[in-house]
Amino acid sequence: MGAPPPAPRSRLCGAWGPFPRVFAAGAVAADSPGFVEDREQRSGVSDPGSLESGWDRLRQLFAKDEQQRFSKEIDYIYRAAVSAGIIGWAYGGIPAFIYAKKRYIEQSQAEIYHNRFDAVQSAHRAATRGFIRYGWRWSWRTAVFVTIFNTVNTGLTVYRNKDAMSHFAIAGAVTGGLFRINLGVRGLVAGSIIGALLGAPMGSLLMALEKYSGETVQERRQKEWKALHEQRLEEWRSSLQVTELLPMEIESGLEKIQPEGDAQRIEELLSLPRNPSSPHQQSKH
């Protein structure tokens, strides 16, 4: 007799035909005790990984460390914003103070004061109002401008992991465009162009100063990140070693505890009272 004809294959089997098959023997071999044990040991310990991706570096930039502190780049952006606010306040407030005092004196020639001190005090109050008004106006604008510029520049540098003059140009274009966006599309385009033209030479100047100092900010950042990664990798390896030694310690502990427990159980059984004899056994006696 010839061999029976093969069973017809369904359309679903035909559709899954090109895909690789996994047989039960292969699955059993893959789930061998050594493989399962190694997989279970490593499941509770996560690999620290490396900061090779740009998004990983950006997340690390804005993340806090073990002491709940931000990175040095964020601290630099904050300090630069505060310094820019102080400089902007002085830049806008001091000329406004002088101008407001002079204008008040010119406009109050016909006024009558009780004494000279009253006149000087009135002029000083007018100058102080001008200092606060125009100083605050220049202060917050300068602080926001510097913050946006440094944030964009630092973000591009960290994401691409290198310094480039184009980062300063892009940061200047973004900052200038945002500050002129209230003037419409023309203001946005004009502000972006002016910002890029001003950012490029500023970037070249800062890069030249960094090279002259011997170590750039990016080189220092890479050293710090490399040291941090090595520290986390060492911690991960030590935790992995502890995880690998834990089953052995548990097994040795069970081997020590089991004989003692068995002996104690036997002693408890022997110390139990014997069962009373049945009436049938008593009649035989």
Swiss-Prot record:
InterPro entries: TIMMDC1. It is found in: Mitochondrion membrane. Coiled coil: none annotated. Keywords: Chaperone, Membrane, Mitochondrion, Phosphoprotein, Transmembrane, Transmembrane helix. Residues 274-285 have a biased composition (Polar residues). Chaperone protein involved in the assembly of the mitochondrial NADH:ubiquinone oxidoreductase complex (complex I). Participates in constructing the membrane arm of complex I. Signal peptide: none annotated. The modification Phosphoserine is found at residue 277. It comes from Mus musculus. This is Complex I assembly factor TIMMDC1, mitochondrial. Belongs to the Tim17/Tim22/Tim23 family. GO terms for cellular component: mitochondrial membrane; mitochondrion; nucleoplasm. Associates with the intermediate 315 kDa subcomplex of incompletely assembled complex I. Interacts with TMEM70. The chain crosses the membrane at residues 80-100, 137-159, 165-185, 188-208. It is a multi-pass membrane protein. Residues 265-285 are annotated as: Disordered. GO terms for biological process: mitochondrial respiratory chain complex I assembly. Pfam families: Tim17 (PF02466).
